[in-house]
Amino acid sequence: SGVITDVSDKIWDYAELSLREYKSGELYAKVLKEEGFTVEHPFDNIETAFRASYGSGKPVIGILAEYDALTGLSQIAGSETRKELVADGNGHGCGHNLLGAGAMAAAFAIKKYLEEKGEGSGKVILYGCPGEEGAATKAFMARDGVFAECDAALTWHPGNVNQVTSGTCNTCIQTEYKFTGVASHAAGAPDKGRYDLDAVELMNIGVQFLREHMPDSARIHYSITD
């Protein structure tokens, strides 16, 4: 338990953003090697991803770990009120320091079971899945067939209740549209101007009407960034 707590605390302090979890990925790789796992890091052409395996035979159980932080959520550990560790810094507002460490604890528990059962009784694989917050690296890993070797894959998420959930989640597709206007003199040549915000508003109106014809399971959200 000391190893797990130490990793969780360090990941909390690192607070690295999606696809920049260099210290976090290296820490997991180091600890897992010390615990007797075979580690690939980087993995699947993702610099901060890793694959750590132990055992042989069937079944093959995959455990998914996440460890990325969020912008602007730096927080002193243990404080129940807002206290930044680093001014305007990153922080684990979604508890991914716990998620990754807890997933590793599960992998350790399965490893212990496999050691007791003996050679050929199964395999456990801990996948380090960076960039959950927006980058969706697990989708690319699935595309590459990474999880095809598993008979089952499990993960968890910190929360204020203990429960088992199942089901599906919506696919996340992000698209960026850029609108460019034409400047003109408001009094001398107003008809020559083209206001880009007008185009943005017209597009949003169209999206509002589109929602009526979409299935209940689909969602469209937008953000005007500039």
Walk through the language-model features, giving the residues of each.
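Acidic/His- and Gly-rich active-site-bordering loop/insert found
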Residues: 1-92, 97-124
